[in-house]
Design a protein with these regions (language model features):
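Noncatalytic, solvent-exposed loop/strand surfaces
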Residues: 1-207
Length: 207
């Protein structure tokens, strides 16, 4: 992502799979700053970072969807989100969490504790609507029960504060993780279809 550092000097901004964001001077390739944006140990970044108005908007997802395929993994405590950073220095401006913190919800077939709500990853690049001062993002499924009303949904956030303005859920009760591929212990009861809204939201004017 091409951004500016506040002095009209360009920056190249990118993220790695461990949820660290880097800003690099494109002329010298020197790292201007580095920011740790992990919400959890399993946080990752799969979409590009959006830039608008001197700020960066980072989509947070989680590879716990795959880790849950291991029956020894205690499922599931992570969730997705959006984090806003100051492009000048990487300072965190606000963060939006896709679910509340997970709490114990019972046990799996093997007697291990299960936690929820979880999931609702932001897999793709957030869409900026400058005219309305909004950010739009698509969300993934829940990884464990209880299901939330913003999984498999489009969410609209205020660009300045990160507050949720509205949401539209396309598919309700989609609770799924990789344990469902082989009937593993972490597969939720009444598992959903693993639908997600995996692509970026398209902002267009309809005549």
């Amino acid at each position: 992502t091409l951004a500016k550092n506040g002095a009209d000097k360009p920056l190249l901004v990118f993220a790695d799979s461990m949820a660290f964001v880097y800003a690099v001077d494109p002329a010298t390739l020197e790292v201007s700053w580095k920011a740790d944006v992990r919400l959890f140990e399993t946080s990752t970044i799969t979409g590009s970072i959006s830039y608008h108005g001197g700020n960066l908007f980072v989509p947070i997802s989680s590879y716990e969807v795959a880790a849950a395929g291991n029956p020894q993994h205690i499922c599931c405590t992570s969730h997705g989100g959006i984090i806003a950073l100051d492009a000048k220095n990487g300072d965190r401006l606000w963060e939006w969490h896709a679910t509340e913190d997970a709490t114990e919800q019972g046990v799996d077939r093997d007697g291990n504790p299960m936690f929820g709500p979880s999931g609702v990853s932001i897999w793709s690049t957030p869409t900026i609507d400058a005219a309305r001062n909004r950010l739009y993002a698509g969300t993934g499924e829940n990884l464990s029960h209880p299901a939330t009303d913003n999984s498999d949904a489009v969410v609209a956030l205020d660009l300045d504060t990160g507050e949720l303005v509205w949401q539209f859920q396309a598919t309700a009760d989609d609770v799924w993780n990789a344990a469902c591929l082989n009937g593993g212990a972490n597969c939720p009861e009444n598992a959903g279809g693993d639908f997600d809204i995996g692509a970026s939201v398209i902002h267009a004017k309809l005549d």
